[in-house]
Regions:
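Sec-dependent signal peptide recognition
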Residues: 2-10
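N-terminal signal peptide c-region/cleavage motif recognized by signal peptidases
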Residues: 14-16
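Activation targets extended, charge/polar-rich intrinsically disordered C-terminal tails
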Residues: 20-113, 223, 240-354
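Gly/Pro-rich turn-and-neighbor structural signature
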Residues: 98-142, 147-153, 268-269
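Glycine-rich catalytic cores of cysteine/serine-nucleophile enzymes that process amide/ester linkages
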Residues: 128-217
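Secondary-structure boundary elements
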Residues: 157-162, 230, 266-272
Length: 354
């Protein structure tokens, strides 16, 4: 039995359930085949027919056979939505807000119980999603998983443009979870064969900026998406459903970029991005697909720390560059008579480069 059903079943033994509506089987099958429900379950057509989910974690599913039967998963979800509200944060409505919203709309579920979803509500309020940016850090040759670049999403609040507060935004990243110290050959092999679990992580954007532009000297391109606040909110709802949920991670297809395309399909149904990548999902190609889908509103560029330093050093002559290096090691030289003898504009350029 799926672990997410255990608290629900335990409470059912001593608390009455509200009656879930009786939905005709034909309608249930219609909803189970709807592209949006298929996207919420990360289902794809199996090679021998039927369905299989990209999710490799039984905790994600409410039905025992939910991994391969979208209809069974839908029926189990509908039933769980009517569990006693006393479950609180363990209630299906709290665990699956995106499923809940969609089923409520499709079936006009106006009589749902109202559990207190404190954990989810606080998490969503803290992120306060309004818009999204697709971020592309350039290739990093020291990592096999990033030799072709990488993509992540930045989730912005409403005032990010007017107050220039992008550093306070959140970065949504999907990456391989690696335990231990695998050597480079084993790392590459397991990455190619899906030997690592992949997880979503939401971290402050400033941490990713420091990692990419300063520690790894990678340039970043930020593609502002034209998602509405409602579309961005739908995407973040589903991210909550994927919290600590594992996928198999493959460097060349089921990777960071492919998973983000799935999220964009949740945000804006009908854009059909993932079907363009049946074999490989190279980050540069996925960015191009997002552009061709008309999702990009603006492009911003953030140079790496190395590029910034080179640009600052460019107007300096050899002696001034030497001063910049010395000042970087010892700022007390700002009071040196030889430095103070330089023209003020040159002093400013040297300090900027240091």
């Amino acid at each position: 039995m799926p672990k997410r059903l255990l608290p629900w079943m335990a409470l059912c033994a001593c608390s009455p359930l509200l009656a879930a509506p009786t939905v005709p089987e034909a309608r249930l099958q219609q909803l189970a085949a709807d592209p949006y429900w298929i996207a919420l379950g990360h289902y794809e057509r199996g090679k021998l027919g039927g369905w299989r989910s990209y999710v490799d974690d039984e905790r994600f599913f409410l039905a025992d056979n939910g991994e391969s039967h979208p209809d069974a998963e839908l029926a189990a979800t509908l039933k769980a939505l009517y569990a006693s509200p006393g479950l609180g944060d363990k209630h299906a409505q709290c665990v699956y807000p995106a499923r809940t919203r969609w089923l409520r709309q499709q079936l006009q579920l106006d009589d749902l119980p109202q559990p207190q979803c404190g954990e989810y509500d606080n998490w969503y309020r803290d992120i306060n999603p309004h818009s999204a940016v697709l971020v592309f850090p350039a290739a990093y040759l020291n990592s096999p998983s990033s030799m072709f670049g990488h993509t992540l999403l930045r989730i912005d609040q409403a005032d990010v443009t007017s107050n220039n507060t992008a550093l306070l935004s959140y970065a949504l990243n999907f990456g391989a979870y690696i335990e231990g110290m695998d050597n480079s050959i084993l790392y590459a092999w397991k990455g190619l064969m899906g030997g690592y679990p992949g997880l979503f992580a939401l971290v402050p954007y400033r941490e990713k900026l420091a990692e990419y532009s300063r520690l790894e000297n990678r340039d970043l391109w930020e593609y502002k998406l034209n998602l509405t606040p409602e579309e961005t909110g739908r995407m973040v709802e589903h991210v909550w459903e994927l919290k600590q949920v594992r996928f198999d991670y493959y460097f060349f297809d089921e990777n960071c970029s492919f998973r983000l395309l799935e999220l964009m399909e949740i945000a804006r149904p009908g854009i059909e991005l993932t079907e363009q990548f049946p074999l490989t999902a190279i980050p540069t190609d996925t960015v191009r697909a997002v552009k061709n889908a008309g999702l990009i509103e603006r492009i911003d560029y953030r140079p790496s720390r190395e590029k910034e330093l080179l640009a600052r050093a460019e107007p300096l002559d050899h002696a001034e560059r030497d001063w910049a290096k010395r000042l970087a090691d010892d700022d007390s030289l700002l009071d040196a008579p030889d430095f103070k003898a330089l023209p003020m504009p040159r002093q400013a350029l040297i300090q900027d480069a240091a």
